[in-house]
Amino acid sequence: MAKAPMRVAVTGAAGQIGYSLLFRIANGDMLGKDQPVILQLLDLPQAQAAVKGVVMELEDCAFPLLAGVVITDDPKVAFKDADVALLVGARPRSKGMERKDLLEANAQIFTVQGKALDEVASRDVKVLVVGNPANTNAYIAMKSAPNLKRENFTAMLRLDHNRALSQIAAKTGKPVSSIEKMFVWGNHSPTMYADYRYATVDGKSVKDMINDPVWNNDVFLPTVGKRGAAIIEARGLSSAASAANAAIDHVHDWVLGSNGKVVTMGIPSNGEYGIPNDVMFGYPVTTANGKYEIVKGLEIDAYSQEKINITLKELEEERAGVQHLLG
């Protein structure tokens, strides 16, 4: 028996990340090879022609799972009955723009989108915010949607997670698929803390294999934290395909389960590990049956606590910077 199509809303559909994302969703990479999808694409009025061009290409791929496409500049049309919403579109930082101005510009976008989701999306919609600053944008959307469950709103830390996995694989000479229990705490920003103290390869401790605190502090964490900037420097454009891939991974595992593997998601805190309530924070989680669960009982040593405090401080400052816009 064929499954009913799932409705997937994507904002910023004409952008670089959107272009890397849509074909993979339509191919079944995100929701499964037996799950038809209807894509509901949102972008600004001036981007509608570009979105139509992308849709022409989607049609030309003749994806068996693509059951329909909606193109719109109205959030209420894009989010109507959405089962999954990928909030990719955000205001990028322009030259000379203060961080405060960036936060405020995005707060306006994500307040509108949060309210629209609240009004028209499926009550079980799974929302992933990709557009930066992702954690705070997710917090704003969540706060603007009081009738949806808090846990429906998440921020993308999976790119940091995947970047960290790749660096550890390179350092240990082991395949990336063999690394388990590596995760990231905090904000999707250079302050994130990638933590491999519990990580294993084939049951052996990664920390013991590497055994190099200087590498951890001076090479590993800065490389992962500043990878986005390094890609812009090299490519002249921001990381789009790897961000799209991380979004696919995040939603795939959330919907279909991570099979016991620990992954990283930015989720609203309930006070776990001393993080204040409602802060949208990167946590180690496992996922099953469409739900995520924070990994409990991890010991936080003094070094890790210091790193967690730094990223938390940044998130609290961002939150304070938009609080007056949330009414």
Curated annotation (Swiss-Prot):
Binding site for NAD(+): 12-18, 106, 113, 130-132
Group of enzyme by EC: oxidoreductase
Keywords: NAD, Oxidoreductase, Tricarboxylic acid cycle
UniProt catalytic activity: (S)-malate + NAD(+) = oxaloacetate + NADH + H(+)
Name listed for the protein in its UniProt record: Malate dehydrogenase
Gene3D superfamilies per the UniProt record, alphabetical: Lactate dehydrogenase/glycoside hydrolase, family 4, C-terminal (3.90.110.10), NAD(P)-binding Rossmann-like Domain (3.40.50.720)
Active site: 188 (proton acceptor)
Record's function text: Catalyzes the reversible oxidation of malate to oxaloacetate.
GO molecular function, one term: L-malate dehydrogenase (NAD+) activity
Family in the record: Belongs to the LDH/MDH superfamily. MDH type 2 family.
Gene assigned in the entry: mdh
Signal sequence bounds: none
Superkingdom to which the source organism belongs: Bacteria
Single biological process term from Gene Ontology: tricarboxylic acid cycle
EC number: 1.1.1.37
Ligand binding (substrate): 93, 99, 132, 163
SUPFAM superfamilies hit by this protein: LDH C-terminal domain-like, NAD(P)-binding Rossmann-fold domains
